[in-house]
A protein has these predicted regions:
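Conserved "HGTGT" condensation-loop signature of ketosynthase/thiolase-family condensing enzymes
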Residues: 1-76, 100
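Conserved beta-strand segments that form the floor/walls of ligand-binding pockets within enzyme
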Residues: 4, 79, 110
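Short glycine-rich or small-residue beta-strand-to-loop segments that form or flank ligand, phosphate
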Residues: 76-83
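Acyl-thioester C-C bond-transforming condensing/cleaving domain
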Residues: 66-72, 86-164
Length: 164
């Protein structure tokens, strides 16, 4: 069996923090300095009640909506990568599996590997496919780093946002 990506999509929270917003909090920096240093102008930030699993769930729902040829009941494994899990048990992948209405026979696994997580997720998915364990893997990522960063941590606040 050949492993390949059928479709990709994303979900962004509504709240946007701009470089201008950050300069108001950290006046020792300029909009230009932030843009030149990190190449980012806007960061999407999750609402207080919005979780990493919520963002990933929205991305998955969007994927199924944008690609009707991909059927939910064809997914037999879900992988969810996050550094900012909502809770320890149950795993977020299981919660997402249930909310999407995926088959109960579908495998579900959370993993966390920082910035390299997506690449490792692709490798895990490929292994599941080539090993004959799964035929269709749904790989999701979701992060709400903003909930874990100190408000005065300008280095990380200029780089990280939230998304699924």
């Amino acid at each position: 069996m050949k492993a390949f990506i059928k479709a990709i999509t994303y979900s962004l929270p509504d709240l946007v923090v701009t470089n201008e917003d950050l300069v108001r909090e950290f006046p020792e920096w300029s909009v230009e300095k932030i843009a030149d240093k990190v190449g980012i102008n806007n960061r999407h930030i999750a609402a207080e009640n919005e979780t990493s699993a919520d963002l990933a769930l929205r991305a998955a729902e969007k994927l199924f909506e944008e690609h009707p040829e991909i059927k939910k009941d064809s997914v037999d494994f879900i992988l969810f990568c996050t550094q900012s899990p909502d809770y320890f048990l149950p795993t977020s992948a299981c919660v997402i599996q249930d909310k999407l209405g995926l088959p109960t026979s579908c495998g579900a696994l959370d993993f966390n590997l920082g910035c390299s997580g997506y690449v490792y997720g692709l490798s895990l998915a490929k292994g599941l496919l080539l090993g004959g364990i799964a035929r269709n893997v749904l790989l999701l990522t979701g992060e709400t780093y903003s909930k874990f960063m100190h408000p005065k941590d300008k280095g990380n606040r200029t780089i990280f946002g939230d998304a699924g």
